[in-house]
Design a protein with these regions (language model features):
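Formylglycine-dependent sulfatase
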Residues: 1-419, 424, 433-457, 496-548
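A contiguous, mid-protein "functional segment" used to position or interact
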Residues: 443-498
Length: 548
């Protein structure tokens, strides 16, 4: 017999205010490629204008050291929804398919009576729902095996890899693929919220994930947002490292992204960053619109708002662009949890991960992850309540630019990076926030200072921990086998009649607006909010059901 998730141990209510039996709604907003160090809520000197996000942060629990589980879209997202590190679920790159038997936060929410919906990007391959009851849009990226990394030919640049075009062609646009997509995401999301509030009195609480594709490159944005930075002298990267002096992984990234032989001018950097800044301001307006809709629909006081992202963007720092590395601008993400009636606004300094969202959401709704299944994520509930919580983050990466598995451990002030193909790295981010002093150098010499002795002890501890945690040879074989198998399947499926795996959302126009089989006056009254009676007087009773 299948286990009843409602019979799992409940989270203990740690305070009189916290009461998961209330089943508040949940709105989870994601931005794509949004670098936390670039935002004003983390960097007071930031040039990016984000008034809505700043207001939200001021009344939220703000995590100052949040990280993604992998600095690439799909692996990061698959780990985020499952609470499991990428290697445990086979999420090796942007064309990896995770098994449908892996529970996600959407499954736990549905089991507790929530209506789970997704609007926007999630980068699913194969199964396009993974526990969501409803997808309001298709995805912006392919849901198949077309983007498989090839470690068998590490020096070959594949057609779909990042390249310099996003930088060289940066600037103003009237419209773009990204804008087309996010405009649909926003329309569907706000419509969903209005549909919810117009449902009958027995409606379920909602858990809506809104996943925007901005500010992901290409670096283009409309004139409205470009002009926000007309009088701003866009800052140039703080750290510049000659390509010959880069670490080995960064050298591979420059080649993978076709940037090795390119000298990007300061003017080109400023144009790309200005467009990125404008795209972040666009995301900020989207956040404002969602929050405004919650307010107007009377949902704000009963909705937990979570905001985060899948990874960051280097934006020219160290000469690097996009993501795919463990430097701060690539791997650190924003994280906010807003629900003032339970959680007083505060800042959390400890290290957390989007991997921790699943067990945290379980705590928020009064359940626990299944004890008979593995779980890498750690609930952030202690942090939300102002108590001592976790301070360790693990991350795994086997996507573009790698030739062997590349792992990270973040704990306290330390960041440790290891890969069998590269030299190890160790940074103390309290003393070296720009990550310029690789303290792994002390492992081969006699420490001369107390700081070096501390660094050597930390390095040796991390080396032993990594060796115990990861079997790099076994992981390499699994990744290679998966890559080869998926390439074989994709090659076969590309021949003959092509059948798409991409999601096609249902949208039956025959059931919307004015139709002959629906009494006109009744329809108009039920579609209006707030509700009114036949004489136009506002009534509080909900009378409509618009979503199955």
């Amino acid at each position: 017999m299948a286990p009843d998730l409602n019979s799992l141990p409940r989270s203990e209510a740690p305070s009189s205010a916290f009461n998961p039996e209330q089943k508040p709604n949940i709105l989870y907003i994601m931005a794509d490629q949004l670098a936390a160090p670039q935002l004003k809520m983390y960097n007071p000197d930031s040039q990016i204008k984000t008034p809505n996000l700043d207001r939200l942060a001021a009344s939220s629990v703000q995590f100052d050291s949040a990280y993604c589980p992998s600095p690439l879209c799909a692996p990061s997202r698959m780990s985020m929804i499952s609470g499991l590190l990428p290697m445990k679920i086979g999420s090796y790159d942007n064309a990896s398919q995770i098994n449908s038997e892996v529970p996600t936060y959407a499954h736990y929410l549905r089991s507790k009576g929530y209506h789970t919906a997704l609007a926007g990007k999630m980068h699913f391959v194969g199964d396009q729902l993974h526990g969501y009851e409803q997808r309001l849009t298709t995805d912006i990226y392919p849901g198949d095996f077309g983007w498989v990394v090839n470690w068998d030919e590490p020096d070959t640049r594949l057609e779909w890899y990042h390249n310099a075009s996003s930088i060289l062609q940066a600037g103003v646009c009237g419209r773009s693929n990204q804008l087309d997509y996010d405009e649909e995401v926003m329309y569907r999301s706000t419509q969903y919220l209005w549909d919810h509030v117009r449902e009958g009195p027995d409606k379920r609480p909602f858990a809506l994930t809104v996943s925007l594709t901005h500010p992901h490159d290409p670096y283009t944005i409309t004139k409205k947002y470009w002009n926000l930075y007309e009088d701003v002298d866009i800052e140039l990267p703080k750290v510049r490292i000659a390509k010959e002096k880069q670490d080995s992984h960064s050298k591979r990234l420059l080649k993978v992204c076709d940037l090795w032989d390119l000298d990007i001018t300061d003017e080109q950097i400023k144009k790309a960053k200005r467009a990125y800044y404008g795209s972040v301001s666009y995301v900020d307006d989207c956040i404002g619109k969602l929050l405004e809709t919650l307010e107007d629909a009377g949902l704000m006081d009963n909705t937990i708002v979570i905001f985060s992202g899948d990874h960051g963007d280097m934006l020219g720092e160290r000469g690097l662009w996009y993501k795919m590395s463990y430097f701060e601008s690539s791997v650190r993400v924003p994280m906010l949890v807003h629900y003032p009636k339970w959680f007083a606004p505060r800042r959390v300094k400890q290290n957390v991960s989007t991997l921790d969202l699943l067990p945290t959401i379980c705590d928020l709704i009064g359940t626990k992850p299944a004890p008979f299944l593995p779980m890498d994520g750690v609930s952030m509930m202690p942090h939300l309540l102002g108590r001592e919580g976790g301070d360790t983050v693990f991350a795994e990466y086997t996507g573009e630019g790698t030739v062997r598995p590349m792992m990270m451990i973040r704990r306290g002030a330390w960041k440790y990076i290891t890969c069998p193909a590269d030299e190890p790295q160790l940074f103390n981010l309290d003393k070296d926030p720009l990550e310029l002093d690789n303290l792994a150098r002390v492992a081969k010499v006699e420490p001369q200072t107390e700081y070096e002795r501390e660094a050597k002890a930390a390095f040796e501890g991390f080396e032993a921990e990594a060796k115990a945690k990861w079997d790099f040879d076994a992981i390499t074989e699994k990744v290679l086998q998966s890559q080869r198998s998926r390439r074989l399947v994709w090659d076969a499926l590309s021949k003959g009649t092509f059948t798409s795996w991409d999601h096609n959302p249902e949208d039956d126009g025959r059931l919307k607006y004015i139709r002959s089989n629906i009494p006109l006056d009744d329809l108009e009254r039920r579609a209006r909010y707030p509700f009114v009676d036949s004489q136009g007087y506002e009534i509080s009773k909900t009378v409509n059901t618009t979503r199955g």
